[in-house]
Regions:
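Immediate post-signal peptide segment of exported/extracytoplasmic ligand-binding proteins
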Residues: 23-57, 75-76, 178-184
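Extracytoplasmic ligand-binding site segments that recognize negatively charged/polar headgroups
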Residues: 57-71, 83-100, 104-238
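Short amphipathic alpha-helical coupling segments at ligand-binding clamshell hinges
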Residues: 70, 211-214, 282-294, 302-303
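Periplasmic-binding protein-like
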Residues: 136-140, 153-156, 182-191, 212-217, 221-224, 294-315, ...
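A bilobed periplasmic-binding-protein/Venus flytrap-type ligand-binding module shared by bacterial periplasmic
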Residues: 157-164, 200-202, 271-286, 302-303
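Extracellular/periplasmic bilobal clamshell ligand-binding domains
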Residues: 317-352
């Protein structure tokens, strides 16, 4: 059992306790009072309050270059200094939970994967927000409890080295990976159990389990930790064909002239990444202001400019023009142990 499994499995499910909504925000208002305020002077109050607070702390799993573009634009627009702590999604979750249980509240914004944000919701770490920009988002970006929202999609696709693999030779079905020509050429990320759940939902669990066992037995598969690393190994040619690459990262490298391109076998699996305001945020005005900024057309265009797949219906991108099946963060969390075990059985046990 991985450390991620032990941590997520140990989180207690919790009910959501609605906070009272006051008619106006106060100078020392709580996150609930700020986040749920919908008056006509909402933006003015957020900006004035954020400047008085003087700072913002973001915990994120986004790459530094990607988050840096958002943060830089926000700081320039509002004059609020932002502190960013970056780590893996599981570390973001673990730090947020550990600090909350110790009554140490330093996080204003959590910006990470959907399942981790859903875990924070269950731990009562996040605060529901009523933002005017929520109406612009695709339905799959919204949660019934409103405590986090999808800002972009991590779309799992396949990527290949264009010098090592010809486009006409690309597999069109998962069964095509049984061809001996793929022996020693396949790679996969170490912890993509939510991707596996999505694929199994498309082709059937019994059929998919048998098929992937045969693929690994016949042609092998290289298992690597981290999607950025896996994508870079495709570029270097060490892994000619990777099965679980985020299409935005492949597109970023392709635009820079790297020998990489991406495609989808069947329906691409999409998982929302998102943002949540901490329930005990020390800088609530700045937190809600950044939340609004990231899901506004301005923030979403910045994400699209980094080749992310934004969730706003007002921002177009060529990266979402493929059929997609969405991972439900709640289901991914509830069934995490099942799919992680199957993923390990299929790919990580006895593989390199």
């Amino acid at each position: 059992m991985s450390s991620k499994t032990r941590f997520i499995a140990g989180l207690a499910a919790a009910a959501v306790f609605p906070a009272a909504v006051l008619g106006q925000t106060k100078p020392n208002a709580t996150a609930a009072e700020v986040a749920l305020y919908e008056g006509p002077d909402r933006l003015q109050k957020l900006v004035e309050g954020a400047k008085k607070e003087g700072g913002l702390a973001i915990y994120t799993s986004a790459q530094s270059d990607d988050m840096g573009m958002l943060v830089g634009a926000f700081e320039k627009k509002y004059g609020v200094r932002v502190s960013v702590w970056r780590s893996s999604s599981e570390n973001v979750l673990q730090r947020a939970v550990t600090e909350a249980r110790a009554n140490r509240f330093t996080m204003d914004i959590a910006e990470t994967n959907g399942p981790e944000l859903e875990s924070m919701h269950r731990e009562k770490i996040l605060q529901a927000v009523k933002s005017p920009y929520l109406a612009d988002l695709i339905p799959q970006a919204l949660r019934p409890h409103g405590e986090w929202v999808g800002t972009r999609l991590n779309v799992f696709t396949q990527a290949y080295n264009t010098k090592a693999v010809r486009k006409e030779d690309l597999p069109k079905r998962w069964e095509d990976l049984l061809d001996p020509k793929w022996k020693g050429k396949l790679g996969i990320e170490q912890e993509d159990s939510d991707w596996l759940a999505g694929v199994m939902g498309e082709i059937g669990e019994a059929k998919g389990t048998k098929l992937f066992k045969e693929i690994v037995a016949k042609n092998g598969i290289s298992v690597r930790k981290g999607h950025t690393l896996l994508t870079q190994l495709v570029v270097s040619g060490e892994i000619p064909l990777a099965l679980t690459v985020y299409n935005y990262k492949a597109e970023q490298l392709k635009r820079k002239g790297a020998p990489i391109d991406w495609f989808a076998i069947g329906t691409a699996i999409a998982r929302p990444n998102g943002i949540g305001v901490a329930r005990r945020a020390p800088h609530p005005h700045a937190a809600v202001l950044f939340y609004d900024f990231e899901i506004s057309p301005e923030g979403q265009k910045i994400l699209a400019g980094r080749d992310f797949v934004p969730t706003s219906k007002k921002v177009d991108t060529p990266l979402n023009k493929i059929p997609m099946k969405f991972v439900d963060a709640r289901v991914a969390l509830d069934e995490f142990q099942k799919w992680e075990k199957l993923y390990a059985d299929l790919f990580t046990k006895g593989t390199k």
